[in-house]
């Protein structure tokens, strides 16, 4: 195994990285983004979906487009889209042991919110292993 003792800082992406994409949590977030746009802008589902993808391409995140084009308050958007069912994931002892064995500080970096990171990493049984979360708000809403 490679000697990792010289590394003093680890940064982990959250969604579809600390848990398998097959859990489909991000699919639920994606669907909630469309629903949010549909409700907020009072437009048809198809139009909301098209706008969601357009904003993602043009602004780097759907939220950035909504903030710029419609004055959407980001915390409200993040709370709404991250209100998801976490039952597809469960405590991952092997992942916890692997992260715990790494030397140095450990951080979660996410385009989501701190609350979302706490909820997901908590469900995985690993949140306590991290020193902090760097979320989209800490990044001044600039996506990774």
Would you name each region that the model predicts?
Residues 101, 111-112:
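Glycine-rich active-site/cofactor-binding loop and its immediate structural neighborhood
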Residues 107, 114-144:
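Substrate-recognition "cap/lid" segment bordering the active-site pocket of phosphatases
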Residues 21, 108-109:
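Small/polar loops that bind or transfer phosphate-bearing groups
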Residues 71, 102-106, 126:
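Short glycine/proline-enriched coil/turn segments at helix->beta-strand junctions
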Residues 1-5, 119-122:
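Short amphipathic alpha-helices and their capping/turn segments at secondary-structure boundaries
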Residues 3-12, 17-96, 115:
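N-terminal helical cap/lid subdomain that shapes the substrate entry/recognition surface
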Residues 49-50, 105-108:
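Short, charged, low-hydrophobicity "junction" segments
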